[in-house]
Amino acid sequence: MAARIAGVNIPVQKHARIALQAIYGIGNSRALEICKEAKIDPATKVKDLSEAELDALRTEVGKFSVEGDLRRERSMDIKRKMDLGAYEGIRHRRGLPLRGQRTRSNARTRKGKRKPIRS
């Protein structure tokens, strides 16, 4: 029996708190909050949950923006900043770090492989 929540097959062998974290947009604290609201013990394995309890989890997860909706929201926020010409948008466009990190000697991950200077 595969448990499906928010379009994601969550692992049935794991505890409810851990299994919920397989959904994009749900971390540890939000998983605990969802379990508390659904009145489910976070240490209960997903395979031991009844269908009613799974429905309660689905309802609670449905209250949050997760998976595709969250990904779309984040990409639209980045696109909006780029269109506005905001500092963060410019940094996104140029593929540079956004949050004030130094780029003279580091930031190789963000900048990519070194490009040779052609003469």
UniProtKB/Swiss-Prot annotation:
Part of the 30S ribosomal subunit. Forms a loose heterodimer with protein S19. Forms two bridges to the 50S subunit in the 70S ribosome. The lineage of its organism: Bacteria, Pseudomonadati, Pseudomonadota, Gammaproteobacteria, Legionellales. Residues 93-119 are annotated as: Disordered. PROSITE patterns: RIBOSOMAL_S13_1, RIBOSOMAL_S13_2. It comes from Coxiella burnetii (strain RSA 493 / Nine Mile phase I). Located at the top of the head of the 30S subunit, it contacts several helices of the 16S rRNA. In the 70S ribosome it contacts the 23S rRNA (bridge B1a) and protein L5 of the 50S subunit (bridge B1b), connecting the 2 subunits; these bridges are implicated in subunit movement. Contacts the tRNAs in the A and P-sites. GO terms for molecular function: rRNA binding; structural constituent of ribosome; tRNA binding. This is Small ribosomal subunit protein uS13. Belongs to the universal ribosomal protein uS13 family. It comes from the Bacteria. Pfam families: Ribosomal_S13 (PF00416). One of its GO terms (biological process) is translation. InterPro entries: Rbsml_uS13_C, Ribosomal_uS13, Ribosomal_uS13-like_H2TH, Ribosomal_uS13_bac-type, Ribosomal_uS13_CS. Disulfide bonds: none annotated. Keywords: Ribonucleoprotein, Ribosomal protein, RNA-binding, rRNA-binding, tRNA-binding. GO terms for cellular component: cytosol; small ribosomal subunit. NCBIfam families: uS13_bact (TIGR03631).
